[in-house]
Every structure is written in C-alpha cells, then in structure tokens.
Amino acid sequence: MPELPEVETIKRTLTPCLREQKIARVEVYHPGVIAAPDPETFSRLLAGRIITGLDRRGKYLLVHLSGEYCLVVHLRMTGRLVFTEGAAPLAPHTHVVFSLAGGPSLRFVDTRRFGRLYLAAKAEVETLPGLRDLGPEPLDPAFDALALAAILAGRRRPIKQVLLDQRLVAGIGNIYADEMLFAAGIDPRRPAASLNHEEVARLRGAMQRVLEQGIANRGTSIRDYVDGSGRQGSNQEHLQVYGRTGRPCPRCGQPLERVRLGGRSTHFCPRCQV
C-alpha cells in the first residue's frame, strides 16, 4: 500500500503536470471505485473544472478544483494515478480516465480495485470516512516528542501497532513502521507506554529521518507503486530490515527476524532493538 512518502511523491510529481489544467471529460470504466457520488454525477460535476492544486493528508491525495468541489483519492493496496501525454493505449486495470484539455490525461489504475475516489464539497472533505478520524501528520513541525509521548501514554498495544493506527498518527504503514523502529533501536513488540522519554525522542527523530528519506528516494517500489509520471521509486534499495528476514542486521550482523503483530509481518533485529 502506498504510504506517506509514496503519496507525497505522487503529489509532487503530479502538481506541475496538473495545476491549471482543465478537465474536459471523465470516463469511468469500473463504477465500483467511485465511492461518492454516483459515477454519472461524478463525471458530470468534474467536467469543465480547473485543477488548482494538490495536497496530501495521511495516505489520501486531495485534488483541489475550481468551484466548490475537491477530488479525494485513496489508493489503498495497488492504486496508481499516472499522468499520460497524448492518446497512449490504456494500461490493464485502468478504471477511470480524466481527459484534460489539449490531449493529456490522468489515469486511475488499480489491479485489485480496492482504491476509492470521492468527489466532495470542499467544506465536507474533512468529514469523509477515514479522513475525519486521521491523527496528526508525523512531518508536521508541531508533532514533536511531547506530542508523540502524549499519544503513547497509557497504551498497552505494541508500539508497531500504535504507529500503524491512522487515528493516532497519519500516513505510516508497514514498511516505514519497521524501518523507523529499527532506526530508533526499539523492539516493535514493546508496549507503547513502556517507552521512556529518551526512547520517545529517539523514535520521533527516526520517524522524521525515515519518512524524509523515503520521499527523497521517491518512494518504495516493491510491487505496484509508481509515481505520478509512471516511474518507480528507489527507496527499496535502502531498506534496513523490511523484507530482509534471515539476512544479517546492517548494524550488528545478527540475522533479522520476522513475527506477526496484529496480522502484519514485522521485521526487526532481536539484538539491536530492545
């Protein structure tokens, strides 16, 4: 699933391509990916609108439009948003095409069809399911060690599961949770409330470094992810623990281990992470 760095990269690659572009028409090939309104109304309301900018909130992409509407995209597991010049053939699993004035298009492609598109009034975007309950942005300067400590206080769940809870912190998924816990030297199975002040500060710093590295490397392409231009990211070449079960820890040489936490594979070093 695209996480914060991937959605941020998509936003940054699409913004110069889409800003001030006019949507000429919208073709929906698989109605199930349109969450709201109905596909016919979705297409009709989008036609003729100007794209004024893009934002990200957690793992959601917000496409701001002229008038009173905003397009909200949640890519889920395998969704892609790709800007395409000219009349290139449709890729397999293309479900929505936003044709832009002058010939280019924005295409929503999703192998598993879990992704969802919403067209909502701007005043109602923050009340959409999923968005309304999102926690703070981990790269927000206001999200400091004190803010993280307040989230962890009193929580007995494993720290890994707390980091994945979008209601507590927005945008973190399985890959980056494993990487930031390794960077901080914290066992993912530890109760969140057991972290002391020094460990919380260390984790806060690791969160920022790991997420910023993911963005600098244009995201992690392990299976489906590509950016808004259709290019893969390179952060998979820099992963320290995720997907490296049995290989030597890059820090101490101990074989890395994998366990299941909350139904998710979790990768860590049994020696370095305590």
From Swiss-Prot:
Which domain of life does this protein belong to? Answer: Bacteria
Quickly give the catalysed reaction: Hydrolysis of DNA containing ring-opened 7-methylguanine residues, releasing 2,6-diamino-4-hydroxy-5-(N-methyl)formamidopyrimidine; 2'-deoxyribonucleotide-(2'-deoxyribose 5'-phosphate)-2'-deoxyribonucleotide-DNA = a 3'-end 2'-deoxyribonucleotide-(2,3-dehydro-2,3-deoxyribose 5'-phosphate)-DNA + a 5'-end 5'-phospho-2'-deoxyribonucleoside-DNA + H(+)
Q: GO molecular function: any one?
A: damaged DNA binding
* Family matches, as PROSITE patterns: FPG_CAT, ZF_FPG_1, ZF_FPG_2
Q: How is the cofactor bound?
A: Binds 1 zinc ion per subunit.
- The FPG-type zinc-finger regions cover 240-274
Q: Name one GO biological process term.
A: base-excision repair
Quaternary state and partners of this protein? Answer: Monomer.
The record, for HAMAP family, names: Fapy_DNA_glycosyl
- The protein, known as: Formamidopyrimidine-DNA glycosylase
Native organism is: Moorella thermoacetica (strain ATCC 39073 / JCM 9320)
